[in-house]
């Protein structure tokens, strides 16, 4: 991983995360002492302390007063907010990471969309109406698709689904910009939104899960056809 951070704090954060990822600081081990680590990275101890607190909040570290800082197994202790970081750390793992992301989206969407249509049809109509005025561009569709799934998640009445989508937002939209550069992907999405609106208006709630899963398979096929040309900077934050 090439560290591109613009600030001392950003550099220190990326250095520590990259070191954990590459097992320089393996899970279960103790992080070097503050003075040693600040000299190694080239930042002040005050800056390092702020970075360590942030990494602890994200699940990379465990900080306990009076005890050495411990490296966590981040797969067990971190949340969805580290997905973009993982994608930047290992470009070769991005296709599998995104496959897993899409599978999770399809599985939970089949549940929350059916609930939303059944219990909050007016809100569902409002959410789906967004698709009628979208520009035919990858950027517009990436944002639209995220907004539709997030809107339907909250329309289900269970805010946990919405919080999951919130956690996926960064990587979801970055992947979407590439995926929706394919006109067939944009066409498929519009047809899917239209099908959901038809199910809503006709109250065919029992068909929702099949429709969502079918869309997951079709969109997955398009995605797999595009995987070989994934941009190396797909997970990079636009500055």
From Swiss-Prot:
Annotated protein name in UniProt:
Fatty acid metabolism regulator protein
HAMAP family assigned = HTH_FadR
Function, as annotated: Multifunctional regulator of fatty acid metabolism.
Query: DNA-binding residues per UniProt?
Result: 34-53
On assembly, the entry states:
Homodimer.
Q: Which domain of life is it from?
A: Bacteria
Instruction: Return the SMART domains for the record.
Output: HTH_GNTR (SM00345)
> Could you tell me which CDD domains the record lists for this protein?
WHTH_GntR
NCBIfam families according to UniProt: fadR_gamma (TIGR02812), PRK04984.1 (NF003444)
GO MF, one term, reads:
fatty-acyl-CoA binding
- Record's keyword terms, sorted: Activator, Cytoplasm, DNA-binding, Fatty acid metabolism, Lipid metabolism, Repressor, Transcription, Transcription regulation
Q: Where in the cell is it found?
A: Cytoplasm
Question: Pfam families given for it?
Answer: FadR_C, GntR
Tell me the ranges covered by the HTH gntR-type domain, including all copies.
6-74
**What InterPro entries does the annotation carry?**
FA-response_TF_FadR (IPR014178), FadR_C (IPR028374), TF_FadR/GntR_C (IPR008920), Tscrpt_reg_HTH_GntR (IPR000524), WH-like_DNA-bd_sf (IPR036388), WH_DNA-bd_sf (IPR036390)
Predominant location category:
cytoplasm
One GO CC annotation: cytoplasm
GO biological process terms, alphabetically, are: fatty acid metabolic process; regulation of fatty acid metabolic process
């Amino acid at each position: 991983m090439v560290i591109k951070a613009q600030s001392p704090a950003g550099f220190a954060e990326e250095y520590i995360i990259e070191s954990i990822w590459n097992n320089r600081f393996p899970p279960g081990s103790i992080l070097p002492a503050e003075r040693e680590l600040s000299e190694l990275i080239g930042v002040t101890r005050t800056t390092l302390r702020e970075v360590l607190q942030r990494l602890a909040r994200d699940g990379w570290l465990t900080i306990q007063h009076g005890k050495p800082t411990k490296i966590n197994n981040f797969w067990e202790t971190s949340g969805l907010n580290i997905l973009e970081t993982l994608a930047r750390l290992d470009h070769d793992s991005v296709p599998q990471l995104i496959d897993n992301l899409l599978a999770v989206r399809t599985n939970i969407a089949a549940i929350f969309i059916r609930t939303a249509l059944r219990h909050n049809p007016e809100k569902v109509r409002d959410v789906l109406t967004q698709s009628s005025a979208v520009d035919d561009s990858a950027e517009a569709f990436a944002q639209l698709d995220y907004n539709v799934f997030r809107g339907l998640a909250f329309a289900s009445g269970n805010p946990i689904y919405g919080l999951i989508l919130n956690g996926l937002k960064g990587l979801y939209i970055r992947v979407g910009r590439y995926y929706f550069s394919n006109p067939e992907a944009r066409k498929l999405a519009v047809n899917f939104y239209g099908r959901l609106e038809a199910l809503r208006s006709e109250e065919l709630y029992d068909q929702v899960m099949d429709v969502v899963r079918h869309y997951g398979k079709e969109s997955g096929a398009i995605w797999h056809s595009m995987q070989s040309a994934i941009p190396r900077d797909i997970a990079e934050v636009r500055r």
